[in-house]
Amino acid sequence: SKEMILGSSGNQGAGAFYSHQIEQSARLDYADNSHFDRNYGDGTDGSNTDFTLSFWIKRVGRFGSTSILINPRDGTSGTALNEVGWDTSNQFYFNNSNSGDTILKTNAVFRDPTSWFNLVISADLNNGTNSERLKIYLNGSEMTYATDNRGSYTSAAGFGRGGSWVLGDYYSGTSYTPDMYLAEHVYIDGTTYGPDSFGETKGGVWIPKSVSGLTFGTLGYYLKFEDSSNLGNDSSGND
């Protein structure tokens, strides 16, 4: 897979090489149970079939322990949700927890405490081709999967649903917070984008692109983590 260079916030160089630089990141710390809560009004729904997520991440600990990256929950039922993160084998997974199914789990493991990487999740759940319904990309390339249940997956239980979403933990409060740095996290509601909307290859490395021209949709958000007094500030224009 391609190496990823973050830019100024990764202390790996800047200047003319980067068309877009990520300036800040947030530290999610298991010891402090640090995470983000995003609360939508119940019944304020978007699309639970077409959505995209992008994360720029550096894991620094909690290897070998279940670590939840994002846990969106339907506010109407309170129990319908998705769960996305790393399992005890450090494989990355996407669960539809309402049915208890693991939809995708990667062959690759994530246990490098030094490198930044970009994860993109693209969903087009009405697609008639099973392999096109849900994809996970690492630094611009689609990953291969140890578990693949996309054939039975046609609507998300949590994504696209108004309710209480948790970034960096499980909704019940049981601590599954990862130890990691998180930069420029984007959720797109209603549109399926590929990884080239969030990054590009330059000089053999994967670097960030500006997302300011993307359509964020009803429930979409854009977290830059640039305001230390309000790290969860949404830069998408929806707040």
Can you annotate each of these PLM segments?
Residues 53-61, 119-121, 167, 182-187, ...:
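Short hydrophobic/aromatic patches on beta-strands that form ligand-binding or substrate-lining surfaces
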Residues 31-93, 127-130, 191-196:
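Extracellular glycan-recognition modules
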Residues 1-24, 31-32, 128-130, 144-150, ...:
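Extended recognition patches within non-cytosolic domains
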Residues 157-182:
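Extracellular glycan-interaction patches encoded by glycine-rich segments
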Residues 70-81, 133-144, 203-208, 238-239:
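Short edge-strand/loop segments of extracellular domains
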Residues 29-51, 102-111, 171-174, 208-214:
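Short surface loop/edge beta-strand patches of beta-sandwich-type extracellular domains
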Residues 6-30, 54-63, 83-154:
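Extracellular glycan-interaction surfaces
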Residues 46-47, 86, 112, 158-161, ...:
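Extracellular/periplasmic catalytic domains that process cell-envelope and extracellular macromolecules
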